[in-house]
């Protein structure tokens, strides 16, 4: 039986190799006949081309094109990086980060159109602060809008519960939150905490926060508030002033100065004891101590370096854990509710919903059920 072979453009294959960022050597090892395909001395089979598409993280149809596809990298200029190492140029994004951005932007764009079509009101607080306001006024404004109980620290038993508590509040205010440690639902493609911890996409109709679920739970809480400040600014851009500003305000929201002063009087420099009370990581407390002039930049850097070298990150939404428990956070619980609403109103087909969430059939039904349960 003759095996069907496919005519391909070698330039398209090279584009896929470059797009994947895996490198030519990895492809040559995976596909021993790659050189012959590139030289056009032999043609790949349909199965071989399908396997290559999967390996390159591109749709199979792209490899059948006569010309290289023009796929722009959808840039984001705000990333909370590990110790805020700075701006990441779009041409430096890893394939995993690039694909994550595309997934999140696609979901946001759908939600913007859906909410406009259904006459949803904009989220009023997006862009409601600016850096000319005093820190106290900003903190008071954000607390008033979000309605976070002042006694939350005494009511919540763990940092994992604290994260869920804050996600619930933010989702109730119209912010869509995704927490994921992998690309989509592909557990073979983990996200790197050293590359980014989170990002925000400011839009009055559908503000979005993405948190890298590969990070430690306590670190995610600070990232969440850091990105909240970006949304209140109404921007997802980064400059030399914005990141320190967002860090400072996030620290003040999580660790108010009056409470920190009381804790410091009792446990000065004992960050383990402070951590137990504030329900936030020592990294956040280091930031608060710096913000409130209890330590200087040099001591802050030393503490962070020591902490990072001795604490392992634990992921709830990475490759581990029960899929049905983590999936609602990966695809966004609040986002799932909009999708369910759209299906019930006839504005979205099940096939379209499957594509939006990256799950289908019984898996889709179970994920939607878990998202509804919260």
What residue ranges belong to the model's regions?
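Active-site hotspot residues in diverse enzymes, especially metal/ion-binding acidic/histidine motifs
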Residues: 1-374
């Amino acid at each position: 039986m003759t095996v069907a072979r496919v005519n391909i453009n070698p330039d398209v294959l090279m584009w896929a190799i470059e797009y994947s960022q895996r490198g030519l050597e990895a492809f040559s090892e995976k596909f021993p006949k790659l050189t012959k395909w590139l030289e056009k001395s032999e043609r790949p089979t349909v199965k071989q081309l399908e396997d290559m598409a999967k390996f390159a993280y591109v749709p199979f149809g792209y490899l059948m094109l006569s010309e290289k596809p023009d796929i722009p990298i959808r840039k984001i200029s705000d990333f909370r990086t590990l110790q805020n190492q700075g701006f990441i140029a779009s041409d430096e994004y890893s394939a995993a980060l690039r694909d994550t951005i595309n997934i999140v932007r696609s979901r946001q764009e759908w939600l913007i159109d859906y909410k406009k079509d259904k006459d949803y009101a904009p989220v009023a607080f997006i862009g409601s602060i600016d850096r000319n306001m005093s820190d106290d006024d900003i903190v008071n404004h954000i607390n008033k809008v979000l309605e976070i109980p002042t006694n939350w620290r005494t009511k919540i038993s763990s940092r994992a519960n604290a994260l869920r508590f804050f996600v619930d509040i933010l989702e109730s205010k119209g912010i869509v939150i995704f927490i994921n440690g992998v690309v989509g639902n592909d557990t073979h493609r983990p996200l790197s905490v050293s590359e980014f911890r989170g990002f925000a996409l400011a839009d009055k109709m559908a503000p979005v926060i993405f948190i890298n679920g590969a990070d430690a739970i306590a670190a995610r809480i600070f990232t969440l508030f850091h990105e909240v400040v970006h949304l209140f600014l109404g921007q997802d851009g980064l400059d030399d002033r914005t990141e320190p500003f967002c860090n400072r305000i996030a620290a003040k929201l999580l660790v108010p100065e009056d409470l920190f002063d009381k804790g410091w009087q009792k446990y000065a420099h004992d960050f383990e004891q402070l951590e137990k009370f504030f329900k936030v990581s020592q990294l956040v407390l280091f930031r608060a101590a710096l913000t409130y002039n209890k330590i200087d930049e040099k001591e802050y850097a030393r503490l962070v370096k020591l902490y990072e070298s001795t604490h392992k990150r634990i992921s709830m939404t990475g490759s581990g854990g029960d899929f049905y428990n983590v999936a609602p956070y990966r695809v966004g619980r609040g986002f799932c509710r909009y999708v369910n609403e759209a299906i019930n109103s006839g504005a979205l087909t099940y096939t379209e919903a499957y594509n939006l969430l990256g799950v289908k059939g019984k898996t889709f039904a179970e994920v939607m059920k878990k998202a509804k349960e919260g």
